[in-house]
């Protein structure tokens, strides 16, 4: 990768500056594409409302939906949302990458004290989208992120009474991998070994809610050990837009494309590949 080339220390000054310029351009393109994607998803959700499918957040719930979410937390979500206090972790990159995390700010009401914690959104257990009770003739769907936000008083129950703010972020570790040239293993096995080894890589890309306060951003970035030319992308509230492929149809199957079966190249199955 370009980051690795820069870190090698073997470049002449002219080459070094050229690569830095390319990386800055890539980061700018990332920001532009993110904005375009956000505009497109907003339009899609607006059009879904024409079909009586509505996306709600934690501030738009009626009493029935609030009670339903409380039961959902105690019946299912509780136990999958254990917080990690930010003061107890120096290196966030030891956590699993490509997952959605909420960094939670807890302001104690009875005294001037602020604490911070990280909560992983357990989307691989429950899915990214949850159908909640309908209202006003609409089928209602929530991001699991927002359900976790709603449940913060339950997650931190037993502690001091607090005001809560939560901001999402995710990080990606260095995806470059070295594949050993060992004829005793198939290509697929060697790739699998390479993928496993790259889990120990350093974070090279961080996406975060652009409404996250600057001082909190600094706390997160410092604990991720991000560098000058790593990709830092402030976006809207939600990340991992690929999860939209699993958005529930709410009974409107005509709104979804048919699924295509995956293809496997025979060459990848060969021991001689």
Report residues per predicted region.
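N-terminal localization/anchoring segments of enzymes in phospholipid and broader phosphate metabolism
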Residues: 1-273
